[in-house]
């Protein structure tokens, strides 16, 4: 049995008002998850992406790829206050 591998960029952010983290994939609109720790959020997001992709495939829809996202980094800017 052949296996096809997919890669997706994910973004993990600190919840603004609650303890924990929130994750989403810019490539898969509507696919998101959360968790108490970064590790739990990453694991939960992996499951959410798997379910999302399986749903797309079951409906015969194309699976978007992260080809447009080639690099992610955080920038810090100093601006006059």
Where are the regions a protein language model picked out?
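Prokaryotic Sec-type signal peptides and long signal-anchor helices
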Residues: 9-12, 36
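Short aromatic-glycine-(Arg/Gly/Cys) micro-motifs in beta-strand/loop hairpins
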Residues: 12-28
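A generic structural signal for ordered secondary structure
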Residues: 22-24, 32, 49, 77-78
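Hydrophobic residues in alpha-helical membrane-spanning segments
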Residues: 27-30, 65
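A short, exposed loop/beta-hairpin motif centered on an aromatic-Gly-Thr core
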Residues: 29-40
